[in-house]
């Protein structure tokens, strides 16, 4: 069985990238939990790249620094959705409030996804719903 997931950064509650960065190029916003990478501070050491089990930070050979999804925090601050949410043609991506999110069909660790509960990723995945089985009543 195959599974395909759209992954950028999971904006973990306890992000390892933030902990291992020697120059504090990562911060976590208190108001929404977005993990921001400040590329101008990055020295390109690769600690964050090696420490993230989800492969979110990537090395940019042109800039010679790491980069990752910023959840378009500037757009969020302006009351707009991140670019990925706005441009997804199937509307598979959305921003949710985990404090009030209650979807019995959503999971934090779907099959094939690295199970790292200590990091507590904020991403949730809606599992495919089973079709409704309709049976004919005997007349």
Which residues does each predicted region cover?
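Non-ligating segments of multi-cofactor redox enzymes
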Residues: 1-139
